[in-house]
C-alpha cells in the first residue's frame, strides 16, 4: 500500500469512527431518555443524578470539613465535562422536582454545593438504577466481558486525546478517573 493510499484509508476510518460515535451519542440520548421516560428523567439529568450518587459526592471526605456531602457546581461540571451554564438549567429542573438540593459552600460563600435530596437518593437507588442496568444490558447485548473492557479502554484513550484538544490554556485538562 502506498503512503498516499494508507493515509486515505486512515482518513476514511477516522471519518467512520467519528460519525459512528456521533450516531451512538444521539441514540444514547434518544433511547436513554425513553428508558427513563416513566420517571421524566432525561439523559442529562441521569448523568447528574449518577454523578451525585457516587460515594465521593454523597459523603465527601467525611472529615467534618466544609466539603462533606455534595459537589460544588464547578466540580460537578468538570466531572460531567459540561459548562456551568449548561448544568445550571438541568440542576434547576432537578431542584424544582425535589431531587437535588443546593446549599452555600461553607468553605467559599461564592460557591454552591449540590447533592441528592432524600427523594432523589431514593429514586436513584430504588427505581432508576434497576432500569439503567437493564438498559445497559440491552445496549451491550452480545458484548463479552473482555469486549466491554476493551471498549472502555478504547473510550478512555479517546477521551484522553479529546482532553488534550480541550486544554483551556492553563494546561489543566478535566479529570475522569474512576469513570
Regions found by a protein language model. Give the residues of each.
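Base-recognition residues in the alpha-helical recognition helix of bacterial helix-turn-helix
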Residues: 19, 47-51, 88-90
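Canonical helix-turn-helix DNA-binding module
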Residues: 59-114
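Charged, amphipathic alpha-helical coiled-coil/dimerization segments
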Residues: 3-5, 92-150
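N-terminal helix-turn-helix DNA-binding core of bacterial DNA-binding proteins
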Residues: 26-83
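Alpha-helical linker/hinge and terminal dimerization helices associated
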Residues: 24, 28-31, 80, 123-142, ...
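C-terminal regulatory/oligomerization modules of transcriptional regulators
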Residues: 1-9, 59-67, 145-179
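N-terminal leader segment of winged-helix/HTH proteins
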Residues: 1-39, 97-99, 146, 179
